């Protein structure tokens, strides 16, 4: 017996059926989440200095990438979020655009193959994607902008843990906005 699967389906060898579902959201959920995250990212560090470790647009990119499970959608969402973040920050245009595009694609690709609904899996994936995102940003700054940047700092570790923890709670809230 042969089973043919489309690109976005996973075959479970134990039970003989696909078990990963693609989540749909109410109209405007993605756009509203994106805009709120980008605006908060721009203004929170101005008023609360400790909020500089947060990367809310990255968390939105990861969540919708893992939930929608379509690499093309994740790629485009990461590009839009990254370029919006670049346009509202003091970074060169494209720095976050490139890094969030890669993360959006990878999150969607992994989301299509793994069940990412468990909080521990979400924490681990968010932490890994955060470190990868920061690595891409540092690589771009070193190679393209010739700016010396350290690879690993204590700030990166703290920011990774804070963003992964916040991500688990944020993802729980965003799960409530799914269509049933």
Locate each region found by the language model.
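Terminal, non-globular segments
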Residues: 1-180
């Amino acid at each position: 017996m042969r089973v043919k699967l489309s690109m976005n389906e996973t075959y479970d060898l134990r039970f003989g059926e696909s078990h990963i579902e693609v989540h749909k959201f109410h109209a405007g959920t993605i756009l509203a989440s994106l805009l709120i995250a980008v605006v908060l990212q721009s203004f929170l560090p101005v008023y609360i200095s400790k909020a500089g470790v947060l990367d809310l647009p990255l968390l939105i990119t990861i969540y919708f990438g893992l939930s929608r499970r379509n690499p093309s959608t994740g790629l485009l969402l990461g590009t839009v979020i990254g370029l919006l973040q670049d346009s509202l920050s003091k970074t060169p245009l494209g720095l976050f655009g490139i890094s969030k595009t890669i993360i959006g694609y990878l999150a969607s690709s992994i989301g299509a193959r793994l069940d990412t609904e468990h909080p521990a899996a979400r924490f681990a994936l968010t932490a890994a994607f955060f470190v990868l995102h920061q690595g891409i940003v540092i690589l771009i700054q070193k190679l393209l902008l010739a700016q010396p940047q350290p690879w690993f700092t204590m700030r990166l570790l703290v920011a990774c843990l804070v963003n992964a923890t916040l991500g688990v709670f944020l993802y729980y809230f965003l799960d409530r906005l799914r269509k049933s």
